[in-house]
């Protein structure tokens, strides 16, 4: 971002002067890098947005509003972030479609897939599911869900906002028709996201946002739009953010996503071992680092998560507390919130031990 503002500072795809052309080349190279990062065959199918929330809404308004009608069904899970929950709830209310849910096992937060064929039927037009819970770190068998969607002719959307920074993405293996994620969860800047889609579904989307750079010709009688990806990228984009996302991807690829995932598994396994030694620590999610990313969600006895978080903060430990934009999952667990520690490539085993040492102070304060 700094390099853009100090060395370029020009808009893209509009100017014939050198700075604009350099900015355009840099911007388009990031599109190529994103396609490589997710295993996509065509970079023209990578659409830049302002984040995962905008990406999901783009599909909801650009595809859902066009195709959903009374009698149709949309299937999501109970573990979704609100950004992949509320848009489909609102779209079903608007179109008359019915919203159905893949249920959750309240004992460990995993999806119950025994009756998947009865949930995803021929009435279903779209299935939207997360690749990794932002509350528990649980990574559901997405490919199994998208395969069932494909069997009945439904379109699938995979929310990879949490997943993209923790594990290797291969859109072919995931079986997704749409894939969405954000830059700020993967060492990149805020305000930039990605929407990827297969040829058929992207070309079938109506633009949901209109303005400059997406058009071929504007007349008083009507407008002609460009081909992908420009057709779905109206206006001046977050150029600096996109370049920052590209730098983040280069950095992660230099480390290797498999190495990142293995490191997180070691950290999570250690946290689960430490938690098992504590009678007053309740962990939410599978107690298995092999099916989770670097998310450790817990409560300490009857202490409110906000109180736990405040004391941990005084000890120099940053955690998030509350319902984590996932109230339906909290309702499944029968709680109002958790304390969530997020582990990443820069954390160490010592950081985990510091967390559990700091919990001793929480116990003393609320003894």
Model-derived regions: residue spans:
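Pyridoxal 5′-phosphate
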Residues: 1-367
């Amino acid at each position: 971002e700094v390099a853009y503002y100090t060395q370029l500072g020009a808009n893209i795809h509009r100017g014939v002067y050198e700075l604009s052309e350099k900015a355009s080349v840099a911007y388009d190279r990031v599109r190529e890098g994103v396609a490589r990062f997710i295993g996509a065959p065509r970079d023209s199918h990578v659409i830049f947005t302002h984040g995962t929330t905008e990406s999901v809404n783009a599909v909801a308004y650009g595809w859902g509003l066009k195709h959903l009608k009374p009698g149709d069904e949309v299937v999501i899970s109970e573990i979704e972030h609100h950004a992949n929950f509320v848009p489909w709830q609102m779209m079903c209310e608007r179109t008359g479609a019915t919203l159905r849910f893949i249920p959750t096992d309240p004992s460990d937060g995993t999806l119950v897939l025994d009756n998947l064929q009865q949930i995803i039927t021929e009435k279903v037009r779209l299935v939207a599911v997360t690749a990794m819970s932002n509350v528990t770190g649980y990574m559901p068998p997405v490919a199994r869900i998208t395969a069932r969607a494909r069997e009945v002719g439904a379109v699938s959307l995979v929310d990879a906002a949490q997943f993209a920074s923790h594990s290797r993405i291969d859109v072919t293996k995931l079986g997704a028709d749409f894939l969405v994620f954000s830059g700020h969860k993967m060492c990149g800047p805020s305000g930039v996201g990605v929407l990827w889609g297969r040829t058929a579904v992207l070309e079938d989307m109506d633009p949901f946002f209109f303005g400059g750079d997406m058009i071929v010709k504007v007349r008083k009688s009507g407008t002609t739009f460009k081909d992908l990806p420009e057709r779905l990228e109206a206006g001046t984009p977050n150029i600096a953010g996109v370049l920052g996302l590209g730098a983040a991807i280069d950095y992660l690829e230099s480390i290797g996503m498999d190495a990142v995932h293995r490191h997180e598994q070691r950290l999570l396994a250690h946290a689960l071992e430490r938690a098992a030694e504590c009678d007053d620590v309740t962990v939410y999610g599978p107690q298995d680092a092999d099916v989770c990313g670097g998310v450790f969600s817990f409560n300490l006895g009857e202490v409110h998560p906000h109180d736990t978080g405040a004391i941990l903060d005084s000890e120099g430990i940053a955690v998030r507390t509350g319902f984590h934009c996932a109230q339906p999952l909290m309702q499944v667990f029968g709680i109002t919130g958790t304390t969530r520690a997020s582990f990443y490539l820069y954390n160490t085993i010592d950081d985990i031990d510091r967390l559990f040492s700091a919990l001793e102070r929480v116990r003393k304060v609320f003894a």
